[in-house]
């Protein structure tokens, strides 16, 4: 198992990170096969207000690849509450299955007391 994060760009207004992960799964049961999982995510953040990410993950267990493109905009941010609007598309593919593009959107509210 391993992971890494590399900051490509960082200044007062912009932040761009690339994250990669690798997971090797070895099974103790000889009837189950071992498999690997890989993933990478590119994250962009503008002034802690607007963010976007592109992701890809592949699992050898099901020979499945997942793709995602997501965005988020902050609508409210005070010392106790944060409200974000998010939206994006996801897609899962394997040799026997393709989910097509699936939209994903909503509001996210975080509050601390």
Swiss-Prot record:
Species: Lonomia obliqua
InterPro entries (alphabetical): Attacin_C
Subcellular location, record wording: Secreted
Single GO cellular component term: extracellular region
Protein name per Swiss-Prot or TrEMBL: Defense protein 2
GO biological process per UniProt: defense response to bacterium; innate immune response
Keyword annotations of the record: Antibiotic, Antimicrobial, Immunity, Innate immunity, Secreted
Main function: Has antibacterial activity against both Gram-positive and Gram-negative bacteria.
Predominant subcellular localization, coarse grouping: secreted
Keyword Secreted: yes
């Amino acid at each position: 198992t391993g992971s890494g994060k590399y900051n490509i760009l960082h200044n007062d207004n912009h932040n761009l990170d690339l994250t990669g992960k690798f997971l090797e799964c070895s099974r103790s049961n000889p009837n189950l096969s071992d498999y690997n999982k890989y993933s990478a995510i590119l994250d962009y953040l503008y002034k802690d207000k607007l963010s976007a990410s592109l992701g890809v993950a592949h699992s050898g267990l099901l020979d499945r690849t997942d793709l995602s493109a997501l965005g988020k905009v902050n609508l409210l941010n005070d010392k106790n509450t944060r409200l974000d609007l998010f939206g994006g598309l996801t897609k899962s593919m394997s040799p026997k299955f393709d989910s097509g593009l699936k939209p994903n959107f909503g509001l996210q509210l975080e509050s601390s007391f």
